[in-house]
């Protein structure tokens, strides 16, 4: 089915429709999958990309900000990178394609393309409502990824890293991961560009965490300076499940990272920590929708942002507490350092509480470096530039140091330090 339109579209919207018409013969999927693909792109064509008039996209005018849509998957060569933590297992999606030979001891690992071909992926491709532009784009174009299952009782002695590496073009991947009961594991989801043309990247991770499991999940995004990165995490926490989620954005020209989290099991707990490093004329938007659906659950969210030059950042955090979710304890904070007069950051915290026996709160700060702290360091002979760098590094490193794996802390601090050295 060729997508036709008579509506007035932007060049990016037109390019998406033309790319789908050009690529559909090569995309994997059975009839049911293509019925979903066609319908979702048709909806995107009819409604267009979101503008500021759409509440969820008010601070990110996606329709006008999205300029670059490569026509195909790109011809660049991408290779797997060394593990973030030396010696840890790595499986990679290179230029949008997963490996037939990927395997991890004691886990079930399959290519997502196989789920598209046999139709098993059709249900999961659905968008999360009328404003889910990322879900629609990804479902329309997704080619591959991994489906990973952790059996009950699995304990990993090193982080498992899934790398999404590209060298330009259109790259659309999917990562459904199911953790059974009583699993203990650390998972690294790493997105990175190597030298090559600019890219439009979309990635959807579907994470289900079973009863009593304790999971640390790290998203490390280091796309190229001209890349668009559209990331989405769909997370479901079961009974007594514990999730520590760390999201680090340190790249990309236009970034939208969405977190849809359901605390669906009694006794479940979420710890979310985010670091957003912005420079140049980039735009990064982190949007979270967190639902506490049952009694006796908890969550804490702390987001740290550093904004240089003419960059623009956004954090939208919505916490919804259902009527039956008594004894919910939810706290959210967003703290931002603006490092230039032209830098901007918008914060929109929201609470929707329908239960009466809860403890919920939120707070936000947007400021320059504390003058007293800067004076203290300079009074001891430290040059101003170095003193500023030390304070910025300490501001974000505090988040990373909450991780228990010292090798992982060291690796992530290295990423942060390298970014700050380049941009500060």
Predicted regions and their residues:
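Conserved beta-strand/loop scaffold segments within soluble protein domains that form the structured core
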Residues: 2-5, 124-382, 396-424
């Amino acid at each position: 089915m060729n997508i036709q339109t008579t509506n007035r579209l932007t060049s990016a919207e037109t390019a998406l429709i033309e790319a789908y018409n050009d690529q559909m013969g090569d995309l994997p999927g059975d009839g049911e999958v293509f019925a979903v693909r066609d319908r979702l792109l048709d909806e995107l064509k009819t409604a267009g990309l979101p503008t500021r008039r759409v509440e969820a996209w008010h601070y990110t005018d996606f329709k006008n900000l999205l300029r670059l849509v490569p026509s195909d998957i790109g011809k660049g060569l991408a290779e797997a990178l060394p593990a973030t933590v030396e010696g840890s297992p790595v499986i990679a999606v290179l230029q949008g394609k997963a490996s037939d030979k990927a395997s991890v001891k004691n886990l079930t690992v399959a290519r997502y393309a196989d789920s598209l071909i046999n139709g098993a992926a059709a249900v999961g491709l659905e968008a999360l409502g009328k404003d889910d532009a990322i879900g629609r784009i990804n479902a329309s174009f997704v080619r591959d990824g991994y489906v990973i299952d952790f059996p009950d009782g699995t304990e990993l002695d090193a982080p498992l890293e899934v790398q999404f590496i590209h060298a330009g073009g259109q790259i659309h991947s999917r990562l459904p991961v199911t953790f059974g009961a009583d699993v203990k594991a650390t998972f690294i989801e790493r997105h990175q560009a190597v030298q090559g043309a600019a890219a439009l990247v979309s990635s959807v991770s579907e994470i289900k965490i079973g009863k009593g499991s304790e999971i640390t999940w790290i998203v490390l995004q280091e796309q190229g300076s001209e890349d668009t990165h559209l990331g989405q995490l769909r997370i479901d926490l079961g009974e007594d499940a514990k999730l520590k989620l760390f999201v680090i954005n340190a790249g990309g020209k236009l970034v939208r990272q969405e977190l849809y989290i359901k605390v669906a099991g009694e006794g479940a707990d979420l710890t979310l920590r985010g670091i957003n490093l912005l420079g140049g004329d980039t735009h990064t938007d982190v949007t979270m929708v967190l639902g506490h659906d049952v009694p006796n659950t908890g969550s804490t969210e702390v987001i740290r942002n550093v904004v240089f030059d003419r960059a623009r950042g956004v954090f939208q955090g919505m916490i919804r507490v259902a009527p039956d979710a008594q004894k919910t304890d939810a706290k959210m904070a967003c703290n931002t350092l603006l490092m230039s007069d032209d830098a901007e950051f918008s914060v929109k915290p929201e609470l929707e509480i329908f239960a009466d026996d809860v403890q919920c709160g939120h707070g936000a700060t947007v400021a320059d470096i504390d003058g007293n702290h800067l004076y203290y360091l300079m009074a001891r002979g430290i040059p101003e530039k170095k003193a500023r760098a030390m304070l910025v590094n300490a501001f974000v490193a505090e988040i990373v140091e909450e991780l228990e794996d010292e090798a992982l802390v060291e690796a992530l601090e290295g990423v942060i330090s390298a970014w700050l050295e380049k941009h500060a």
